[in-house]
């Protein structure tokens, strides 16, 4: 059989003129061999025992070859050349696996003998001697084979090897064609895509490819080809008399530093690709630019032997119409025509974001180009001039969304530290790479997105007549020194410490606002007020970013402790700040100021960076006092509170508020300020057809798709660190019709059940109460769309995504504002695995395969370690907030009471009856 298959593979390789056959071609060979050796064979070869024997024989050969394959793949990953014999072994093993897989999953289940055995097994209560023993043995062998297939790790490596090899062969062929072309030639979208892909995977020391977009900055911001090395050179910014020196010093004067640096290295790139749109003037300027680069590059001559300059055939419009048209930064030009629900109907995933969330917090890796996919690097002062005008005139500016599942997750790396190659939604994990390479997680410059610091210089009006020399002259007269007062933001960031290498996650429901008009002696007073003169930001406090320069790599002590002054009933704010600063990942990005790179002033619900900026100032003040001070001190958070009041009037006065509500406000506000998709249009409601199809899916799959839809409008470090999701399902008790909605959350509010006199209440009881199936009252009955009238119905909540940091609010106040003071027992180590939706049934939407949905950290178990407790004493009308926060092994647990803080002698004190908001961090290996 082996020689027969080898001969067939060789014949197919010759026929297709390729060293490698595709997965589909190898599968076809496997199917043909099954027909040849089994189906058309003797009758005895078709009984269950014979088929199982054949599978066992083939499996033994497969296992034997797998040892060699590990070495082959290891050598390939190290860059070694792979021999033809090695390639044949890999392809042969794939056929072996596929033969076994088809026999076990397709042929055997269709045997009448197999059906009878299954029937006997399910209906028989007692054994019937040898026959039943024989049937039992056959079923055992079958189940063992099936389990072996499902748990086999080698097939994923084989598939990855074959796919990557075919892709690389194609890329090499395309690049060879480009190497033979002369400067000034036109290249196709296929060739450009090959160059981009080859550049991303290249180990060469030479920089591969630079794209120059010759359109207006406004059009560039809206949408451009998605690649790492790309600059925008506006058509109006240069003329025929320019040299390469003029381009650098004049045309790029308002460009970001990152683009200027790329252009300065233009002679080091292997390929430079020019492209524009169909505008006649732009096409003319494209030719002018080509002439400048080829014939007037005096400062850095470009040699055709080292650097080739090509023009993209059909320009940007042609790229959009090609198969790679969705590979653009910002939203797709055709995005408005894509229904948000198309993934449920026909598997069209192009309307989803499918961003690759980082393994750590976004923006805290050494290079932004390799960190969070949609995060933006900091702009330089000079690009503010033009970008502010563009943003003011383009309120619909949309950040980029990525392409389909198939492109982004073919190399998706699971964040699970234990099983980096598993896919929760894959039955057999056959399609996951064994050693996937990181995705090209571009961190576009501000010109690619819309994240900018606040407080720009006054923007002069730019003339619209692009063909006049006046504009060029004005550009030449711009004085770089006039912008010198704006400090550039360093594009480098540092790695955030994390309690553990945890996955990442997601978002929030709105909660009912409660004004807790409390007073406290010495703590908070309802009568104490802030002087009116203090209730506005002075001119000196205007929001500029001149002092927000991301710090170079610094080993911060993230467990610093500083008290906070009570500004008159502001203990609700103080306790939450102390707890949130126990989240190391969040504290880090505000200490090193890498958050500033991601402020999105166009976010529709954001504060233009006000909240994020003043929160950062507060963190810096606290850290500085802790580091510089020789004794316990406290600081006044007055400016931060004023900033909160300017965003939400609820926090403007000196009245007491609910600390849980402030926690929700703060995290939501930071999210919107840093939301990279905050200017995207809202999601459309699902059509009835799409909703009906979604209801047929498991919660596991439907919630994952809904999460991807959610990320198209909400994508920030807060999502990564704090946000989760739950499903709310209504069910008609008459016809069993269901309707499910998926709600993101930042703070999860859970009810406290009625106390059983014999037992204490545990937090697990609260989660059971939160997720129990509830019979709706008569006046709350659901209007069932199937029955077309109100029917007896039920409602049930199910947690579908658990975040990296879980904030739990114990709902102590009822609808009448009475407080429940029952002691809820919560552990230091909390296991929420039983409350997580784990109902995957193998069903996907049409067109979506089992290896295409990102896991996003949703791999059980879900265990959490307590690190913060916000406590509330008293009643609705008089009370006080304090906090317990874990400050590492050295300092242990500290108790914060406004300005005062002290070590906790017994950490068990953190478990107390006054707990109101709990902060948990996900941990592994416990």
UniProtKB/Swiss-Prot annotation:
**Membrane topology (UniProt):** Peripheral membrane protein
Could you say how this protein's activity is regulated?
RFU1 is an inhibitor of deubiquitination activity.
Q: Molecular function terms in GO for this entry?
A: cysteine-type deubiquitinase activity
User: Which terms does the UniProt entry file under GO BP?
Assistant: ATP export; endocytosis; free ubiquitin chain depolymerization; intralumenal vesicle formation; protein deubiquitination; regulation of DNA replication; ubiquitin recycling; ubiquitin-dependent protein catabolic process
Where in the cell does this protein reside? Cytoplasm; Late endosome membrane
Under the heading SUPFAM superfamilies, the entry gives: Cysteine proteinases (SSF54001), Rhodanese/Cell cycle control phosphatase (SSF52821)
Q: Is Hydrolase found in the keyword set?
A: yes
Task: Describe what happens upon changing residue 829 to A.
Answer: Impairs deubiquitination activity and binding to BRO1
InterPro entries in UniProt: Papain-like_cys_pep_sf, Peptidase_C19_UCH, Rhodanese-like_dom, Rhodanese-like_dom_sf, Ub_carboxyl-term_hydrolase, USP_CS, USP_dom
Q: Which reaction does it catalyse?
A: Thiol-dependent hydrolysis of ester, thioester, amide, peptide and isopeptide bonds formed by the C-terminal Gly of ubiquitin (a 76-residue protein attached to proteins as an intracellular targeting signal)
UniProt family annotation: Belongs to the peptidase C19 family.
Listed name of the protein: Ubiquitin carboxyl-terminal hydrolase 4
Q: What organism does this protein naturally occur in?
A: Saccharomyces cerevisiae (strain ATCC 204508 / S288c) (Baker's yeast)
């Amino acid at each position: 059989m082996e020689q027969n298959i080898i001969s067939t593979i060789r014949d197919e390789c010759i026929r297709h003129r390729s060293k490698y056959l595709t997965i589909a071609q190898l599968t076809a060979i496997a199917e043909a061999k099954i027909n040849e050796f089994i189906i058309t064979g003797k009758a005895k070869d078709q009984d269950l025992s014979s088929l199982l024997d054949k599978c066992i024989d083939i499996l033994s050969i497969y296992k034997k070859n797998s040892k060699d394959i590990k070495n082959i793949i290891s050598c390939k990953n190290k860059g070694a050349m792979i021999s033809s014999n090695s390639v044949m072994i890999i392809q042969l093993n794939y056929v072996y696996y596929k033969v076994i897989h088809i026999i076990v999953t397709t042929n055997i289940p269709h045997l009448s003998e197999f059906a009878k055995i299954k029937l006997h097994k399910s209906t028989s209560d007692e054994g019937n001697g040898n026959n039943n023993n024989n049937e039992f043995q056959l079923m055992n062998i079958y189940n063992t084979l099936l389990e072996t297939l499902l748990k086999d790790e080698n097939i994923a490596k084989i598939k990855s090897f074959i796919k990557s090899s075919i892709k690389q062969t194609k890329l090499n062929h395309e690049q060879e064609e480009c190497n033979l072309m002369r400067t000034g030639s036109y290249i196709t979208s296929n060739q450009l895509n090959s160059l981009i892909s080859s550049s991303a995977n290249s180990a060469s020391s030479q920089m591969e490819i630079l794209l120059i977009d010759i359109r207006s900055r406004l059009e560039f911001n809206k949408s451009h080809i998605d690649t790492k090395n790309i600059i925008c050179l506006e058509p109006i910014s240069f003329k025929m008399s320019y040299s390469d020196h003029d381009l650098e010093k004049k045309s790029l004067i308002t460009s970001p530093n990152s683009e200027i640096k790329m252009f300065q290295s233009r002679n080091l790139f292997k390929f430079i690709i020019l492209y524009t749109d169909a505008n006649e003037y732009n096409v003319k300027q494209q030719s002018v630019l080509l002439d400048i680069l080829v014939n007037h590059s005096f400062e850095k001559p470009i040699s055709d032997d080292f650097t080739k300059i090509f023009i993209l055939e059909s320009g940007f419009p042609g790229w959009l119409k090609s198969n790679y048209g969705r590979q653009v930064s910002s939203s797709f030009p055709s995005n408005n025509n894509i229904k948000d629900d198309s993934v449920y109907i026909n598997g069209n995933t192009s309307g989803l974001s499918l961003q690759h969330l980082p393994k750590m917090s976004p923006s805290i890796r050494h290079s932004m180009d390799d960190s969070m996919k949609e995060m933006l690097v900091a702009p330089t002062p000079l690009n503010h001039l033009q970008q502010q005008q563009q943003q003011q005139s383009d309120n619909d500016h949309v950040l980029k969304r990525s392409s389909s599942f198939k492109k982004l997750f073919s190399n998706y790396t699971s964040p699970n530290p234990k099983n980096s190659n598993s896919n929760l939604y894959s039955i057999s994990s056959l399609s996951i790479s064994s050693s996937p390479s990181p995705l090209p997680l571009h961190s576009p410059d501000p010109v690619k997105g819309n994240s900018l610091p606040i407080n720009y210089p006054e923007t002069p009006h730019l003339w619209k007549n692009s063909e006049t020399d006046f504009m060029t002259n004005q550009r030449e007269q711009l004085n770089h020194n006039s912008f010198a007062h704006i400090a550039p933001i360093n594009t480098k960031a540092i790695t955030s410490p994390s309690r553990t290498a945890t996955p990442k996650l997601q978002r929030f429901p709105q909660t009912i606002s409660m004004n807790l008009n409390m007073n406290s002696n010495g703590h908070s007073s309802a009568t104490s007020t802030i002087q009116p003169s203090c209730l506005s930001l002075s001119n000196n406090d205007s929001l500029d970013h001149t002092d927000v320069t991301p710090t170079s790599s610094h080993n911060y002590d993230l467990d610093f402790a500083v008290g906070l002054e009570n500004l008159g009933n502001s203990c609700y704010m103080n306790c939450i700040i102390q707890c949130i600063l126990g989240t190391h990942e969040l504290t880090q990005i505000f200490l090193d100021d890498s958050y500033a790179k991601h402020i999105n002033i166009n976010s529709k619900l954001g504060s233009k960076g006000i909240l994020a900026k003043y929160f950062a100032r507060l963190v810096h003040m606290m850290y500085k006092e802790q580091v510089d001070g020789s004794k316990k001190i406290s600081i006044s958070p007055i400016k931060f509170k004023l900033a909160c009041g300017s965003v939400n009037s609820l926090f403007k006065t000196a009245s007491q508020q609910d600390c849980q509500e402030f926690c929700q406000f703060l995290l939501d506000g930071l999210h919107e300020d840093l939301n990279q998709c905050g200017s995207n249009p809202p999601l459309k409601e699902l059509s009835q057809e799409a909703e009906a199809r979604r209801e047929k899916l498991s919660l596991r799959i439907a919630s994952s798709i809904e999460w991807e839809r959610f990320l198209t409008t909400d994508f920030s470090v807060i999502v990564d660190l704090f946000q989760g999701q739950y499903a709310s399902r209504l069910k008609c008790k008459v016809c069993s019709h269901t309707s499910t909605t998926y709600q993101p959350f930042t703070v999860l509010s859970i009810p406290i059940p009625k106390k059983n006199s014999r037992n204490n209440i545990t937090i697990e009881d609260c989660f059971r109460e939160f997720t129990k199936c509830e019979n709706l009252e008569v006046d709350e009955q659901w209007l069932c769309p199937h029955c077309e009238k109100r029917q007896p119905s039920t409602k049930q909540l199910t947690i579908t995504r658990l975040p990296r940091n879980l904030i739990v609010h114990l709902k102590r106040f009822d609808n009448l504002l009475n407080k429940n003071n029952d002691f809820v027992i919560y552990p230091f180590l909390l296991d929420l695995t039983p409350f997580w939706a784990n109902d995957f049934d193998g069903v996907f939407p049409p067109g979506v395969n089992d290896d295409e949905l990102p896991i996003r950290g949703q791999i059980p178990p879900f265990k959490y370690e307590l690190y913060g407790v916000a406590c509330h004493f008293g009643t609705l009308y008089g009370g006080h907030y304090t906090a317990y926060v874990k400050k590492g092994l050295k300092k242990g647990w500290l108790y914060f009471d406004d300005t005062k803080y002290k070590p906790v002698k017994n950490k068990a004190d953190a478990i107390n009856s006054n707990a109101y908001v709990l902060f948990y961090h996900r941990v592994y290996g416990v």
